[in-house]
């Protein structure tokens, strides 16, 4: 079993902000699979089980994401953990993968590292840097960024579909890494 976590903040206030990239990508995946999330009070998270994957959206707010991840890990005992998250150190249009390592100052990852460890896979979605970190990550994408954001989120969703079928992180990494921003046609 694999735990697949999309990071974000609950409530409409934060819907579709840069920091909610993980939520948005998982929502798109679940919708395409014709499934739905169910709220679990036990884990304070929205859950969806598909094949041998548990898809999770913590409802704790970003800085406490580790609480939901730990609770779910302890209950389901997954062999693998993959976190989908925004990364302001990467330009919009870039998708990278990582196995373990530091949290890069991402508070959701800090919480997971503190409570669970940092031994997990990551799907990092670039959101670019802006002036004022908090204001930037909690802002929505600009209208001129929407086409690129949509293409990148679709690319990330396809990477997750590949991973669900293959169970092969390295193959997903080799096939779906975007070191340079994705080119889209106007």
Curated annotation (Swiss-Prot):
Subcellular location: Cytoplasm
Record has RNA-binding as a keyword: yes
Domain of life assignment: Bacteria
EC nos: 3.1.1.29
Stabilizes the basic form of H active site to accept a proton (site feature) positions: 86
GO annotation terms (biological process): protein quality control for misfolded or incompletely synthesized proteins; rescue of stalled ribosome
Keyword terms, alphabetized: Cytoplasm, Hydrolase, RNA-binding, tRNA-binding
Pfam families membership: Pept_tRNA_hydro
Molecular function as annotated in GO: peptidyl-tRNA hydrolase activity; tRNA binding
Role, per record: Hydrolyzes ribosome-free peptidyl-tRNAs (with 1 or more amino acids incorporated), which drop off the ribosome during protein synthesis, or as a result of ribosome stalling. Catalyzes the release of premature peptidyl moieties from peptidyl-tRNA molecules trapped in stalled 50S ribosomal subunits, and thus maintains levels of free tRNAs and 50S ribosomes.
Protein name: Peptidyl-tRNA hydrolase
Organism: Helicobacter pylori (strain HPAG1)
